[in-house]
Amino acid sequence: MTDDVYALDSTKGNYAYLIFGEEIILVDTGRPGQGKGILNDLKSMDMEPQDVKHILITHHDVDHIGSLAFLQQATGAKIWASKEDIPYIYGEKNRPGIKKLISYIMRVKKPENINSYPEDGKIGNIEAISTPGHTPGHVCFIYNGVLFAGDLLRTSNGKIAPMKSFMNWNDSVLNESLVKIDNYDFEWICPAHGEPLKRNGQLKELY
């Protein structure tokens, strides 16, 4: 990948990423209890928690917002999520299906003062792109030729793979989002689940 993007080792399996752009940005926060590991990752890079200025959330699933409240308090960073998913993060709406059970088992402390993404989708030099389907307000990000895919897709054995249907809010809407994102210019795909890999024209195999 590029020298200014890092997959955080402590979140392997459901990756959070650091972006060294105009400001330092964290994409997603992992499961409950992974926040301390993320702080240790920062320390290993000679960084202080307060160096992180923004936390961008791809979607409301517990394995992506589980350490959000902890890291908000530790870093003082500004929190961003989609207006569609913010009510789920605050607990004002229940997650559907199996996700409701998961959120009941994995109790998550609620963050405060979440900002919805700007209409133009710009956070500094990062572009937020609406890609609903996995959740109603799922968002991907593009920075410097890298797509931060969240759970729009996953990777497995060096290939792009679809998300499991039973985990998606709406499969047909997700398919539309795959078509949409394939029209954007990027070289690398950084998923939450699976390892980063080069695009190499594989997206069309998913829709």
Identify what each model region corresponds to.
Residues 25-27, 56, 79, 146-148, ...:
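Residue-level marker for buried hydrophobic side chains located in beta-strands
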Residues 32-33, 85-130, 136-201, 206:
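Metallo-beta-lactamase
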Residues 76-83, 150-151, 167:
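Short hydrophobic/aromatic-enriched beta-strand-loop microsegments
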